[in-house]
Amino acid sequence: MGQNKKLFIEDGVVGIAIGISFLLKYKYVEGDVNDVLQDIDDYIYKGACVVLENETAPDTKLPTLDILIFYIVRYIDVKAPVRKRFYGKLIEHLFNYIYIHRQDSFYQESYPFSLKKDSYLFLCVLVWIYKIGIAQKRIGHILEEIKPFLFSCFPVLHANRFQLMTVARCVGKFVNDKEW
């Protein structure tokens, strides 16, 4: 693998790795997912370590959410208990990092409308992590902290209102909280 590859889903190594994982999982291509993804997995892990260790400017777009999604996919697909525990701890560390380092714009409405609103995408990923059973108590506390901030901002654009309502219903359904 060459150096200086992007770690984003839409135009980077993480998207390629998720695509390869999909092809292997559904038998479009033959092979062992751990063997095929070994180099990419190592590269993403090193990139994640660099991202987590370095302080960046507040306006810098980091691939932490994309890396988190990649490791959730790997966690679901892996069978070895040691790797599963490793990915579980890494997932927990990544979502805590994202939550702790969120910016002021995390709760602000996006103009123009965007499907990739970080706060909503993060909530959907938290629900996904909650469903697979990683750090459910911590995620419950995060959701309780986010709830008042999220519902105190009333989106002006109808599409943003609909997106907020949809994400809130999804969260409420999967964590069994009727207040959402």
Locations of the language-model features?
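Glycan-recognition and catalytic cores of secretory/periplasmic carbohydrate-active enzymes
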Residues: 1-180
